[in-house]
């Protein structure tokens, strides 16, 4: 498995991945406080070679949150690309992510985070932290939800 975090580059990289809006029964959004920067973000990550996006998000959610998700419980929200998906990493890497965004309302397991996170917490939609890593993805989800 080769993920961009393992490489050291000083040019812009293009990376495909997936992220998830995970909602609890109170309609709160799960965010992770990332260990590599002082920002809250959505669970998700990069796609492995030959992997389907559905498998990417199911794997990333399990790795990062310990939650189990079934493919039939994935709701496609959007595919997001462009400059809004630019990430400047502390090691100097610059990555533009093509991100498949899912919404997940049904899952099982006990929430536990891995070493990629300092903390995880469900937030009320109107009380999200200001220091977000994925504000564009959250806004896309909120806009789509409002238009339904």
Segments the model singles out, each with a brief description of its role:
Residues 1-19, 25, 92-93:
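Acidic, metal-coordinating catalytic segment for phosphate/diphosphate chemistry
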Residues 15, 35-37, 42, 95-99:
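Short connector loops at helix/strand junctions that flank enzyme active sites
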Residues 22, 101-105, 122-124:
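Short, well-ordered beta-strand micro-motif
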Residues 24-64:
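Conserved Nudix-box catalytic region and its N-terminal flanking loop in Nudix hydrolases
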Residues 28-29, 108-112:
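Short helix-loop capping/hinge motifs at secondary-structure junctions, enriched
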Residues 38-40, 110-148:
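Nudix hydrolase/Nudix homology domain
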Residues 67-109:
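Active-site segment of metal-dependent pyrophosphate-handling enzymes
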């Amino acid at each position: 498995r080769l993920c961009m975090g393992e490489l050291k580059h000083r040019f812009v990289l293009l990376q495909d991945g997936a992220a998830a809006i995970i909602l609890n029964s109170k309609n709160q959004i799960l965010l992770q406080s990332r260990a590599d920067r002082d920002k809250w973000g959505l669970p998700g990550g990069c796609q492995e070679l030959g992997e389907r996006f559905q498998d990417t998000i199911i794997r990333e959610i399990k790795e990062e949150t310990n939650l189990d998700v079934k493919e039939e419980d994935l709701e496609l929200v959007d595919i997001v690309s462009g400059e809004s998906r630019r990430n400047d990493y502390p090691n100097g890497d610059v990555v533009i992510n093509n991100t498949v965004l899912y919404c997940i309302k049904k899952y099982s397991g006990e929430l536990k985070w891995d070493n990629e996170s300092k903390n995880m917490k469900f937030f009320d939609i109107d009380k999200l932290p200001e220091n977000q890593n994925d504000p564009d993805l959250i806004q896309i989800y909120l806009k789509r939800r409002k238009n339904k």
